Each structure stands twice: as structure tokens, then as C-alpha cells.
Amino acid sequence: KDTNGDDRADIKEVLFSGWGVGDTHAGPSNLRYGFDNWIYGTVGYARFNGSIGGKQHNFGMGVFRFKSDASDIEFLHQFNNNTWGLGFNTAGDVFGSTANNNPTFYGGIPATIYNGERKMSAKMIADTPAFHPITPNIRQVDAFNAYTAGCGHAFATSDAFPEKYRDRAAFVCGPTGNLVGSYNIIKKGAGYTAKNAFSFVASADEWFSPIVAEVGPDGHLWIADWYNFIIQHNPTPSV
């Protein structure tokens, strides 16, 4: 809290600790306010291992939520990689994206429902992880021509979008392909399936590295561009 107007925090309060710091791109991200008044977020393999309210928690690679007073935290959806995307449709269903060819997941039943029993892992619902850059000059070293660094998963919930997009199109960034892709999220039984809908934005600028795309207060799509030729931690390929 800034108490004297100098734009610096004079009062700092640690809500809880326990986040792994061994790898910066595997830590927590995507904090956002949920429909249920909890704060949601994602974490990668750096994990969380700490005690809150007298209860020990240890989880990683998926979606969590916590109360704003830090009195409780819950791990909700188990994904299979560093999780960099998080989104909700208007029904409040939870979706996400991860590294390594996993651009869209549906959370499904929260892990808290199982009361300590074996938890169900979320499944990737995309028909294909392929993306569609408009230049051959892209840099990837572990997965090729696909969402190796999928991040963001915002839905087109604004009336500013054409009707065919509303609450159906999800925007997943592919910084290693210099693009923002989209998937059509389609109801299927008790879950969803996702159909690749090509690129929503793509650039031939090799430094264009979108890392999140969200619907802004004006109803339009806002894009955060890291703008860096190297977006990953991986070494320069030898071939």
C-alpha cells in the first residue's frame, strides 16, 4: 500500500509463501478474479509447497484458486505442463493452455470434489496443436510448427465481436510463431472440444511475441507483446 503518494509500496503484506523459484518460467501466473469471489491462477512445474490455514499443500502444473485474505487455497485442475494460459467462458467453466503442443485444456470437475481420492487430470481438447505463422522465419527447438509456448486463453465475450465469435472463440498466443491463434470451443456432452480456427493475428516481424490476448474494457482484443526475438529458455539450435 502506498501511504504517501510516491508510487512506492510503504506497507507490504505477505499473504503466503511456498512458491518454487527454481525456474522462472515455471512459476505462478495469470492471477485473476473469479466468478466465485476467489482469485484464480496457474503454476508450472516449479510448484507450490506450503502451509495455509494449518493445512499443507503441494501441487504443480495446473490451475489453483485462493481466498483474497489468504485463508485458504485449492488446487483445481491438473494439467501436464507449464501452464501459461487461463480463461473462463460466460458459464464460468475453466480453460487453460500449456507448453509443448497443448494449446487448450478444459478443466472439468475440480479436484476438490474428489475429497482426497485419486484426481482426474484435465485433457487437451484441441483437434490439432498446429499453428499457422505467415513467415518461415520462426525459431523453435523442441516442437515444430505448433504451440510449443501456448499462453493466454481468453474468450470473445464482448458484443463488439461478430456473433459467431461470442463465447465461442478462444484466443491462444503462440509467441514462437509470432501470432495469436484462435480455437472454436464447442460443447460436446459434459465437456468441450476445440477446433483450430487459424490465426486471428499474425506478423512477419520476427520480434513480435504475443504472450497474452484479453478482451479489454472497450470490448476489443488487447494484446501484450513481449517483443523479443528469443522467447524461450532453450539454447540456440545447432541445425
Indicate residue ranges for each PLM-predicted region.
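Beta-propeller domains with acidic blade repeats across secreted/periplasmic ectodomains
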Residues: 1-239
